C-alpha cells in the first residue's frame, strides 16, 4: 500500500498538484478499511491522476485537436458553411445596397447545392459518458474540505473522457473512412525504414505543404481548385513513432517538423490504434490536411445527475451529440507505405 500511495503522490506532484498529497493521517484512515474498500479507493485515486494527465495533454493552448471541434449549437450548422468556402467557377453576384448576406448565401446554395452535396459526407454521432460517486464510502477517507474537491475532480473527468473519445475515435474513424473510400489523395510507396525513404517523404511533404497554399486541384480527391491560405489551417496527423523517425537530425533541414509541433499543429494518433490499410494494401504513415477537410461539430454537451438514496451514490453522466464528417474538395493527403520497423 505504501508503494501505491507514494506513486500516486509522485504523479500528482508531477502534474502540478503539490497540495493534494495523501498524508500520514489519511493513510491511518485508509488502513482501517477492508482490503476491498482500499482497492476501490485506490482505483478512484488512480483514475483522477490519469485524467489529470489527459487534461494536461488537452490543454486548449497546446492541443492541436481543439481546432477541429466547432460549436454547432449556438449558430446552427448547414451546408452553407462550406458552400461559401469552395465554389469553383461561381459567377460573382452584383451587390447593391439592398443585397444582403442572407440573399447571397441563398442564391449560392440554390445554384450549387447538388454538386456540393454529393461531395459532403456527414452523419450524426451520440455518446454518453457515465460515472458514479459513492459519497458514503469517500467520507470515511477524506476530510470534509478535501471530499468536495475529489468528487468535483471525478465529475470533470467526463469532459476529458469525451475529448479523448472525439480525438481517438471520431477523428481517426473519419480518416479511415476517407482512405477506404478514396476521399483523400493517397501518396503511396513511401518508407521511413531507410535514409533515402525518409528524405524522399520529407521532401514530398514539404512540396505538398507549399502546394497547399497555391490555387490548384492536385491535393483534394474531387480535383476542385482549392487553396489553404494560412499556415494555421495546415495540420499534420501521425503516430509518434513515425514522427520521431522522420525528424532525425541529419534531415532536419528538409522540413522543420519541430516548428510545426511548437505551433500546436501536429496531432498524434495513439500507437496502438489500427489505421487500417489503403485500397492498395499499404499502411497510412502520415497525413497533411487542411483542417476544413474534417468536421467535428458539437450540437449538445450536457451533464446530468441522478441521486440513488438507498445506495448512497450519485450517478453522473455527460451526453455529447454532434455532426462528424469530411468532404472531397478541401486539401487532404495521406502518405502510405511500409509500416515503421527497426531502422535498417
Question: At which residue positions do the language-model features occur?
Answer:
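Extended oligomerization regions of viral-like shell subunits
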Residues: 196-302
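Extended, compositionally biased alpha-helical segments that mediate assembly or anchoring
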Residues: 1-58, 257-344
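Alpha-helix boundary/N-cap detector
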Residues: 2, 28-40, 145, 149, ...
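Mature, Sec-exported extracytoplasmic domains of Gram-positive
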Residues: 28, 154, 179-201, 305-307, ...
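Long, contiguous amphipathic alpha-helices that act as assembly "spine/axial" helices in icosahedral shell
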Residues: 114-183, 315-322
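Long, hydrophobic alpha/beta structural blocks
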Residues: 98-102, 106-108, 112-121, 138, ...
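Short glycine-rich, low-complexity/disordered patches
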Residues: 24, 57-64, 164-181, 217-219
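Assembly/oligomerization interface modules of large self-assembling protein complexes
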Residues: 44-130
Amino acid at each position: 500500500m505504501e508503494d501505491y500511495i507514494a506513486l500516486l503522490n509522485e504523479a500528482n506532484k508531477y502534474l502540478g498538484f503539490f497540495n493534494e498529497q495523501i498524508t500520514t493521517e489519511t493513510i491511518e484512515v485508509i488502513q482501517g478499511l477492508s482490503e476491498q474498500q482500499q482497492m476501490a479507493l485506490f482505483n478512484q485515486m488512480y483514475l483522477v491522476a490519469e485524467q489529470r494527465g489527459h487534461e494536461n495533454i488537452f490543454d486548449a493552448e497546446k492541443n492541436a485537436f481543439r481546432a477541429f471541434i466547432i460549436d454547432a449549437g449556438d449558430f446552427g450548422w448547414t451546408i452553407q458553411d462550406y458552400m461559401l468556402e469552395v465554389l469553383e467557377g461561381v459567377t460573382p453576384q452584383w451587390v447593391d445596397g439592398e443585397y444582403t448576406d442572407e440573399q447571397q448565401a441563398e442564391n449560392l446554395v440554390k445554384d450549387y447545392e447538388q454538386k456540393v452535396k454529393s461531395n459532403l459526407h456527414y452523419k450524426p454521432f451520440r455518446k454518453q459518458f457515465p460515472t458514479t460517486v459513492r459519497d458514503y464510502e469517500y467520507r470515511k477517507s477524506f476530510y470534509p474540505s478535501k471530499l468536495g474537491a475529489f468528487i468535483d475532480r471525478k465529475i470533470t473527468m467526463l469532459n476529458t473522457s469525451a475529448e479523448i473519445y472525439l480525438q481517438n475515435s471520431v477523428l481517426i474513424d473519419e480518416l479511415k473512412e476517407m482512405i477506404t473510400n478514396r476521399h483523400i489523395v493517397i501518396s503511396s510507396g513511401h518508407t521511413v525504414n531507410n535514409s533515402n525513404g525518409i528524405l524522399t517523404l520529407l521532401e514530398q511533404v514539404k512540396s505538398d505543404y507549399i502546394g497547399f497554399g497555391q490555387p490548384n486541384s492536385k491535393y483534394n480527391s474531387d480535383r476542385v481548385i482549392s487553396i489553404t491560405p494560412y499556415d494555421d489551417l495546415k495540420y499534420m496527423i501521425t503516430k509518434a513513432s513515425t514522427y520521431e523517425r522522420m525528424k532525425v537530425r541529419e534531415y532536419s533541414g528538409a522540413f522543420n517538423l519541430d516548428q510545426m509541433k511548437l505551433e500546436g499543429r501536429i496531432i498524434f494518433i495513439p500507437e496502438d490504434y489500427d489505421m487500417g490499410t489503403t485500397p492498395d494494401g499499404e499502411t497510412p504513415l502520415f497525413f497533411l490536411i487542411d483542417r476544413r477537410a474534417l468536421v467535428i461539430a458539437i450540437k449538445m454537451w450536457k451533464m446530468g445527475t441522478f441521486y440513488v438514496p438507498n445506495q448512497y451514490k450519485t450517478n453522473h453522466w455527460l451526453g455529447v451529440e454532434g455532426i462528424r464528417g469530411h468532404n472531397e474538395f478541401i486539401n487532404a493527403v495521406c502518405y502510405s507505405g511500409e509500416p515503421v520497423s527497426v531502422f535498417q
